[in-house]
Design a protein with these regions (language model features):
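Conserved alpha/beta catalytic core and glycan-binding cleft of carbohydrate-active enzymes
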Residues: 1-92, 138-139, 146-148, 155, ...
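Carbohydrate-interacting/catalytic domains
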Residues: 74, 79, 83-203
C-alpha cells in the first residue's frame, strides 16, 4: 500500500492529517466508489526499498503515533526488521544502509509500544475486520473508528507538542482500553501533547 505509506510520513512531516485520512477514506470508506473496502492490503512505514521511517520523520516523538496508525488502519501491518528498535537508514549511492547486518538491540520504549500494538491487533477483532469511519479531524488531530459486530473502537491522536481540543459531531460513553479509564464524550475530546488514545464504546 504505497499510497498510504507516503500519506503516513508526509502527514506527520507536513502537520496535515487530511492527507492520510483522505487516502483511508478513499481506500476503505463505506461509499460505493471506495477502492478496497473489505480488503486487507499490506501496510508499512518502511521496507527494503525506502528510507527508514526513523530517518524520514522530522519529529521522532511522533514514531509511536505513526505506528499506532499503521496497526489500527484497515489492512495488515508490516514491521521491517530493525525498525522495532527505531534504527535509521537513508539511501546513499546504494541501498546498503536500508538493510544492514545488525546485532540485537536493547529493548526500548518504541519496542514496547509496538509490542502493545501487536497485542491490541491480535485481541481486538475490529482492528482486523471492522469497517472504517472518519469521526473528526483537524490538521494535527484526528479520530477514526473501527467497528465490527463485537466492538466499536475510536483511535484518537494528537501529533502536536502541545495540548489541544478536537471538536466533532459524536458522543457516547467510552473506556480507554489501556488505562480502563471511563471517558464520556460529548462532541469534543481533549488531548495532551503527542497523545494517542484508543477508546472502546460501551454505550
Amino acid at each position: 500500500n504505497y499510497e498510504c505509506y507516503k500519506g503516513l510520513y508526509s502527514s506527520f512531516n507536513s502537520a496535515n492529517f487530511y492527507e492520510i485520512l483522505y487516502s483511508l477514506n478513499r481506500q476503505f470508506g463505506k461509499d460505493p466508489w471506495c477502492l478496497y473496502t473489505g480488503k486487507h492490503l499490506f501496510n508499512f512505514v518502511d521496507n527494503h526499498d525506502v528510507e527508514r521511517v526513523a530517518s524520514i520523520l522530522e519529529d521522532k516523538n511522533q514514531l509511536p503515533l505513526i505506528y499506532t496508525m499503521l496497526f489500527t488502519m484497515p489492512g495488515i501491518p508490516c514491521i521491517y526488521y530493525g525498525s522495532e528498535w527505531g534504527i535509521e537508514g537513508k539511501k546513499n549511492w546504494n541501498d546498503t544502509d536500508l538493510r544492514p547486518e545488525i546485532k540485537v538491540f536493547e529493548w526500548n520504549e518504541l519496542t514496547d509500544t509496538i509490542q502493545k500494538l501487536i497485542h491490541l491487533k491480535h485481541n481486538h477483532s475490529a482492528l482486523s475486520y471492522g469497517d472504517y469511519t472518519q469521526i473528526g479531524i483537524t490538521n494535527t488531530a484526528c479520530i477514526y473508528q473501527r467497528q465490527d459486530e463485537k466492538e466499536c473502537l475510536w483511535i484518537c491522536m494528537n501529533m502536536k507538542n502541545e495540548a489541544q481540543t478536537l471538536g466533532f459531531n459524536g458522543q457516547g460513553n467510552f473506556i480507554d482500553i489501556e488505562t480502563n479509564e471511563e471517558v464520556p464524550v460529548h462532541n469534543a475530546l481533549e488531548f495532551k501533547p503527542y497523545e494517542v488514545r484508543i477508546l472502546k464504546k460501551v454505550s
